[in-house]
């Protein structure tokens, strides 16, 4: 499944969450609310999730193999690096 669009919807210079992203696949399916997070080993993505009644977070949508996760993460982080200095909202 090809990634046809990556939209960085919100960028923040403060805190560990750096951006909120939407990714479109094959111009047919979009996943909103993917987060770009700054961790101890650099930036990574967190798929959209919701909090369960017992306080645990569960992904709403996520890739089912490593290759797809890496493809999505690379596309998002490449786009984030392009736009992060253009539109910083504090």
Swiss-Prot record:
Record's keyword terms, sorted: Cell cycle, Cell division, Septation
Listed SUPFAM superfamilies: SpoVG-like (SSF160537)
Keyword Cell division listed: yes
Organism field: Clostridium perfringens (strain 13 / Type A)
Gene3D superfamilies, sorted: Stage V sporulation protein G
One BP annotation, GO: division septum assembly
PANTHER family: SEPTATION PROTEIN SPOVG-RELATED
UniProt-recorded name of the protein: Putative septation protein SpoVG
Listed InterPro entries: SpoVG (IPR007170), SpoVG_sf (IPR036751)
The UniProt record lists the keyword Cell division: yes
HAMAP family: SpoVG
